[in-house]
Amino acid sequence: QHVIANSSEQEFDYPKGEENVYISYPGKGGVEISNFWRKFLFGWKFDGTSLLLSGYPTKESRVMFHRNIRERVGTLAPFLKLDNDPYIVLAENKLYWIVDAYTASEDFPYSQRFRASQITRQRGDFDPVFSRHKLSYLEGSNYIRNSVKAVVDAFNGSVDLYVFDPEDPLLKAWSSVFPGLFKPREQMPDALEKHIRYPADLLLTQGLVYSKYHMTDPGVFYNQEDLWIRATEKYYGQVQPVEPYYIMWEPPDAQNAEFVLILPFTPKNRQV
């Protein structure tokens, strides 16, 4: 849904005593409605004659669209698979959204395709909604790399795509097709890089595959003697698989606690 910012109608900001404080958007996000033809074309695209006939927009007004974080990044780089869990961070006194982006393929040689529903059904890992993470966007892939971190400025909407796996061949190909679209990791501000985390969707995908392919003995693998399934827990009286979760954890002999992502498994048919 589009919005018109910096119109003649000011926005409510906060109450102050018996009065209200109003504000107009002072940023550079969106596209200026600086003349009749822009106003006409945006009105044609978004809401017919309402924008054209309204007296609220001014020459300083801006129309904002593609405001959903995943939609915004996906419009710029539709060839990337985007994580379901964008997260907001505070860095340098500003708010930013960070989205994990993946390069993926269904045609990697000698690699089994990821079939989430099939994996859970075959192993008795019941999960009727297949977790809150909804891995359907990775379904069928047999090559997945978390090669890019997308950063969206929450104030002006600018998007930066930082490369976190420069050796990824798919990303190399896309970088050559769209020079200048990606920035090296070294250009990411330190304040932002401190907020980078391992994505839960990726760990869940890797964990479901690893629950079978951790077996290295050919005989054990052939007979499927050591299959794992996700650990279970009771939640409001219902038994459900444990979702990946972040914790602060201090490893043995470590000086400081670390922010880690955990996904527990148990041997099949041996869970309590």
Task: Locate predicted features.
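Soluble extracytoplasmic regions of secretory-pathway and membrane proteins
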Residues: 1-272
